[in-house]
Amino acid sequence: MYTQTIYELSQEAERLLLLSLEHLRLLQQLPVASLDGVAQEDGEGNENTRPQHVSGRDVEAQHGTLNNELRKITRLEMVLAIVGTMKAGKSTTINAIVGTEVLPNRNRPMTALPTLIRHTPGQKEPVLHFSHVAPIDTLMQTLQQRMQACDRQHLTQVLEIDKDMNALLQRIEKGVAFERHYLGAQPIFHCLKSLNDLVRLSKALGVDFPFAAYAAIEHIPVIEVEFVHLAGLENYPGQLTLLDTPGPNEAGQPHLQKMLNEQLARASAVLAVMDYTQLKSISDEEVRQAIAAVGKSVPLYALVNKFDQKDRNSDDEEQVRALISGTLMNGSITPGQIFPVSSMWGYLANRARHELRVHGRLPDHQEQRWVQDFAEAALGRRWRSADLDDIEHIRHAADLLWEDSLFEQPVQRLIHAAYANASLYALRSASHKLLNYAQRAREYLDFRYHGLTVAHDALQVNISRVEEDMRQLQVSQDRVSDEVGHEVERMMEAANTFLSQQQADILHRIAPLFR
């Protein structure tokens, strides 16, 4: 019954979205230039009465939003957008949520392009799909030409060239294009690092990166992997997907703010990752402004990362919740939706527990460096290699580290709930976007109706005035015609009288001549 109800509601939502898209197409065809004069006259001195124009940009944005909701409702997909700065540990938090390392960690911005991470049951090894790769190929060809004309010494002065950037430069010189699919963590890391380094390189060479080509969510890279926390759970109607968004002004690219705002507005819910040690910093303030701009259109949650750095003089959990909810977010997020955590501890603990569950032991700490990080966090700085051989001790230490990370609560209340109710989130998101579009369309059409009504009334008044003027003109014309006729008759009579007198006078004078 539940599944059937969800299906019927999704079908109705799909019908309404298609109807709204058709309505938007018709709305786009309405002439708007004629409203400018009305706006200036009617809105003079009153800003609230100015028209709401349907510009090409507005229509494109609304069209993208509705199409995005149509895509989500077709898949019953709940998209949880994750926003935060590089220093807040956004990538680490996503890795902790997924339960394995799907995003690379570097000490520089790593999200020039949004990336989807979709929970795919049974997909143990992550796979990245990058179908819309053509704009990147074109960019690399342009960069290849610029590099041929650019002095390498000059490039080193305007760009930090590390081993990853050097590999990218060699790749561009050789004309090696991006693949459409990458299987495994390391190939995915290499792809994402290269994409982000392309942004830095493009800026250094004065070439525009094709951000606009990736405004649509179906064009951005997608990583499919089974979330460890959701493995083995009951299959629910719907799909859970994380959206890794670019941070505000990330990598010195201020125009990414527009892309961030659009992606947040199109999400089903928003999860902000904040830095416990920098809650009042400028960077975290930019994150707060970004999610505050979304308003009440989507549910908001917050993870306060790096809570493991709390000391006896720092704010505790309740104080942090009160600070963020009240002072920093002005009540736009409730304390119950704020979770202080340690993403690094959560990621390391869950990764270790997963390795123990699947392989029965941890990998060699010399080959996989995360094992060293785990050992230091769970066993202390004085751990030894032999400690890793005590499987029961390691399992217990991983459980304690997971408990200390405080990640269990957000996983249960947010991730599990989002997965179980993904279809409901998708329906809620579609309903809200439909209502928002309907309200904006109604406001615009009401204004159009008001403008046309005012124009019609004014036109009727002007027509009446013209008709009255024509009547007055006719009356004046008739009066003048009578007066002119009368004057002509008087002049004709005077002329005839004068001619008769002259004739009589002439006859009187010439009469003696004929006697």
Question: Which sequence ranges carry the predicted segments?
Answer:
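Globular "head" domains of long coiled-coil molecular machines
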Residues: 67, 71-421
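Long amphipathic alpha-helical scaffold segments
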Residues: 45-80
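Secondary-structure edge/capping motif, primarily at the C-terminal ends of alpha-helices
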Residues: 27-38, 277, 417, 421, ...
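Charged, amphipathic alpha-helical linker segments immediately N-terminal to NTP-binding catalytic cores
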Residues: 1-57
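Catalytic cores of large soluble enzymes that bind and process phosphate-bearing ligands
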Residues: 5, 54, 58, 316, ...
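Register-specific recognition of a single heptad position within extended alpha-helical repeats
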Residues: 4, 11, 53, 60, ...
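C-terminal helical "lid" subdomain and adjoining coupling/linker elements of P-loop NTPases
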Residues: 388-405, 416-458
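A non-catalytic, extended alpha-helical scaffold characteristic of dynamin-superfamily P-loop GTPases
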Residues: 446, 450-515
